[in-house]
Each structure stands twice: as C-alpha cells, then as structure tokens.
C-alpha cells in the first residue's frame, strides 16, 4: 500500500487519502470541509497570496473561529508583488489576525529583503532569462523552507476547478510529497462568480486591481488584466505555456531542492 511521510512524522496512506476525498465530496459547503479539516489535521495552516478564493477562506475561518481555532496564515512574498497586494496583506492582517493576537508568517527569497536585493544577488529580469530558476528562488524554496520551519503538515489553498488547466482535475485533498504536506482545497467547486458574490456580501477586503480587469493576481511582471470571456487565469504568464508558478508544482523543482539540501 502506498504511504506518504508528512512533516511532524505523520504517515498517510493512499487508502486514507481516497477515503477522505470520497467522504468530503458529500459535504455541501466549503465551511463543512474547513471545519472537518480543523478538527482532523494537526499543524494546519492556510497559504495565500490574497487572491479572492484565499480571502473567502480567511473570512470563513474567522467566522468559524468562534467554535474552532484560527489556523495561522503563510504568505510567500516574492518581492515582486504589486504594491496593492502588499497593502491588502496589511489590511487583512489588521482585520482578521491582530484581533486574535496572530501575525501573518511572511517568507521571502533566501537572503533577500527587497527586489533590489534579489536583482543584486541573481541578476536583473531573472524571470525572462530563466523562468524556472526564478520560480524556484522566489516561490518554491521560500515555501519549502516555511513548511519545514513552521512544522506544517497541511494547508488550505485557494485553488478551484473552474480556474481551468490542470486545476480542473483537482481533488479536495491532495498530497505534496516533496514538501511533506497535505493540500486542502475547500472551495474547489465554486465559480469565480460565487467567490466574488461572497466577497461582496460579507464586505471582505480585496485587491483593488480586481476593479481594473485583473482576476488572478501574481507578480507584477507576469500578470495582466483579462478580457471578457477569457479564462480567469488567462492574465498570468500571457503568451507562455505555463499555468502554475511552481508552488503547486513542487515536483518540477525536486532537483533544485536536492542541490540546496
């Protein structure tokens, strides 16, 4: 039987994983998936870059925290985010985490505190010269380091099937063997319209770039507004074949991680 070794010496079998997904698909709301996950998995965090789905999850977690604990939040600061994203991060921290005496865990590229530091260390416009290396240094390595240092075994993500490409085949719970974590996708079956409706109905702060035609927001150099009728992630890496930044495709970077081990 296939077994997976997670952080904190937790062992999960493929049979368990399949059973969880079979049972969770029967639940009617994301809140039920979230509540079940909180009571089931130790060392549970949320990871987000403050996209709409992640913001919905934060608000749901906050409301559920009256009964359950509030999982801590991990943010990977690539040092290339839009200023609006960083402003939103501060707003979210003040609204949701400071009242619970929590701070958002921020991880940056190793040895860098600013975009200038990153360019000085790795060269200007690395994303144009070696896209995989950039993704590894700015996103994959900081996330891997965070999972280990914070002893994370499971994370909530904001991925949904309606985002298309590889995400259309998502399961509610997935294994990330390289990082030793489970990834839980509580809003897996929601559409963009459902997500935005929740944001508006619950007065959840969101990135002001959404009002300028952006839908999926990543680094400033690889994010564009989308046109009417386009896939919501069509503005990411426009003109390139890639659809993921690397954080959710860690196995692609196994060789880099081995070199750094």
UniProtKB/Swiss-Prot annotation:
Give the signal sequence positions.
none
| Gene3D superfamilies membership | HUPs
- The keyword NADP belongs to this UniProt entry's keyword annotation: yes
Name of the top EC class for this enzyme = oxidoreductase
Catalysed reactions, semicolon-separated: [thioredoxin]-disulfide + sulfite + adenosine 3',5'-bisphosphate + 2 H(+) = [thioredoxin]-dithiol + 3'-phosphoadenylyl sulfate
Cellular-component GO terms for this entry? cytoplasm; cytosol
Annotated GO MF terms: 3'-phosphoadenylylselenate reductase activity; phosphoadenylyl-sulfate reductase (thioredoxin) activity
| One Pfam family of this chain | PAPS_reduct
Keyword Transcription regulation applies: no
Assigned keywords, A-Z: Amino-acid biosynthesis, Cysteine biosynthesis, Methionine biosynthesis, NADP, Oxidoreductase
Q: What Enzyme Commission number does this protein have? A: 1.8.4.8
Q: Which GO terms describe its biological process?
A: cysteine biosynthetic process; glutathione biosynthetic process; hydrogen sulfide biosynthetic process; methionine biosynthetic process; sulfate assimilation, phosphoadenylyl sulfate reduction by phosphoadenylyl-sulfate reductase (thioredoxin)
Q: In which pathway does it act?
A: Sulfur metabolism; hydrogen sulfide biosynthesis; sulfite from sulfate: step 3/3
Report the InterPro entries cross-referenced here. PAPS/APS_Rdtase, PAPS_reduct_dom, PAPS_reductase_CysH, Rossmann-like_a/b/a_fold
The family note in this entry says:
Belongs to the PAPS reductase family. CysH subfamily.
Any further remarks?
Present with 217 molecules/cell in log phase SD medium.
Chain's role: The NADP dependent reduction of PAPS into sulfite involves thioredoxin which probably plays the role of a thiol carrier.
Designated name of the protein: Phosphoadenosine phosphosulfate reductase
- Say which species the protein is native to: Saccharomyces cerevisiae (strain ATCC 204508 / S288c)
Q: What is the lineage of its organism?
A: Eukaryota, Fungi, Dikarya, Ascomycota, Saccharomycotina
């Amino acid at each position: 039987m296939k077994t997976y070794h997670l952080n904190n010496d937790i062992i999960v079998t493929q049979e368990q994983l399949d059973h969880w997904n079979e049972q969770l698909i029967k639940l009617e709301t994301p809140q039920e998936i979230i509540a079940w996950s909180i009571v089931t998995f130790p060392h549970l965090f949320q990871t987000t870059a403050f996209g709409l789905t992640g913001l919905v999850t934060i608000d749901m977690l906050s409301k559920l925290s009256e009964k359950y604990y509030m999982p801590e939040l991990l943010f990977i600061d690539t040092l290339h985010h839009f200023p609006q994203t960083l402003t939103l991060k501060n707003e979210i921290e003040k609204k949701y985490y400071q009242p619970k005496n929590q701070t958002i865990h921020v991880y940056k590229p190793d040895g860098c505190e600013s975009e200038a530091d990153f360019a000085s260390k790795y060269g200007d416009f690395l994303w144009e010269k070696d896209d995989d290396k950039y993704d590894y240094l700015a996103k994959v390595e900081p996330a891997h380091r965070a999972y280990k240092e914070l002893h994370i075994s499971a994370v909530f993500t904001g991925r949904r099937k309606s985002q298309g490409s590889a995400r259309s085949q998502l399961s509610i719970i997935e294994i990330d063997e390289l990082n030793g974590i489970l990834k839980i996708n509580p809003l897996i079956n929601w559409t963009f319209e459902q997500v935005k409706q929740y944001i508006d109905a619950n007065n959840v702060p969101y990135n002001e770039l959404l009002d300028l035609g952006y839908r999926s927001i990543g680094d400033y150099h690889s994010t564009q507004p989308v046109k009417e009728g386009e896939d919501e992630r069509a503005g990411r890496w426009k003109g390139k074949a890639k659809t993921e930044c690397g954080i959710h495709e860690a196995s692609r970077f196994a060789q880099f991680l081995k070199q750094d081990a």
